[in-house]
C-alpha cells in the first residue's frame, strides 16, 4: 500500500494551461515526489487524442479543438463535468497500464453504485457505461513510468456538444450523465466520493488536500 495521495481542487480552469502544468509536473518530478490527482472543470473544449482522426470531429463550430498527447480519440469537456488528472508514479505503485485503467474504472463504478446507478466497463473500449451509454471517459499517457491525463465523469452538464463529434471515435455513441440517472446532484459531493474511491482502488493509505497553484 502506498502512503498518501494528494488532491488539488482547481475549480474551473482553461484546458491548455492545465495541460502544460501536467506535462511540467511529470517531467520535473523526482522518485520521491508525492502522487497527485488534480480535480478540475473546463470551459467548453474538444480535445483530440494521439490517435485522433479528423473525421470524428463532425461540426465543432465555435468550440475550440486542442490536440493533446493522451491516448484515445476526440472527447468533449465542459462545465458540470468532473475531470481528474492522475499524476502517479505507476512504476512505484507496481501497476501495469491495463491494471491502472481497470482500477480507475472500478473506482468510477463504485462511485456510481453509491448513487444506485449500475455501471460497467468494456474490455475493448476504456471508460464506464450505463446501459450502453457512456458516462465516464478515460485517456492516459505514461511517460517514464509516470501517468498524466486521466478521467472525465459527466455529472450535471450540457451533453449537446457530444453530438458535434463521434465521442472517443465511435459514431452514434450515446452519452449520459449522473444527473439524468440519479436526480439533482451536487458536484462537490461527487468530487468527495470520487476522492475516496480513487484512494481505495489505487491502494493508498490516506489522502490529503494540497494547496497552492499549479504554475
UniProtKB/Swiss-Prot annotation:
Pathway: Protein modification; protein lipoylation via endogenous pathway; protein N(6)-(lipoyl)lysine from octanoyl-[acyl-carrier-protein]: step 1/2. Substrate binds at residues 70-77, 137-139, 150-152. GO terms for molecular function: lipoyl(octanoyl) transferase activity. Residues 31-206 form the BPL/LPL catalytic domain. GO terms for cellular component: cytoplasm. It is found in: Cytoplasm. It catalyses: octanoyl-[ACP] + L-lysyl-[protein] = N(6)-octanoyl-L-lysyl-[protein] + holo-[ACP] + H(+). Disulfide bonds: none annotated. It is an enzyme of class 2 (transferase). InterPro entries: aa-tRNA-synth_II/BPL/LPL, BPL_LPL_catalytic, Octanoyltransferase, Octanoyltransferase_CS. Its EC number is 2.3.1.181. The active site is at 168 (acyl-thioester intermediate). Catalyzes the transfer of endogenously produced octanoic acid from octanoyl-acyl-carrier-protein onto the lipoyl domains of lipoate-dependent enzymes. Lipoyl-ACP can also act as a substrate although octanoyl-ACP is likely to be the physiological substrate. In the reaction, the free carboxyl group of octanoic acid is attached via an amide linkage to the epsilon-amino group of a specific lysine residue of lipoyl domains of lipoate-dependent enzymes. This is Octanoyltransferase.
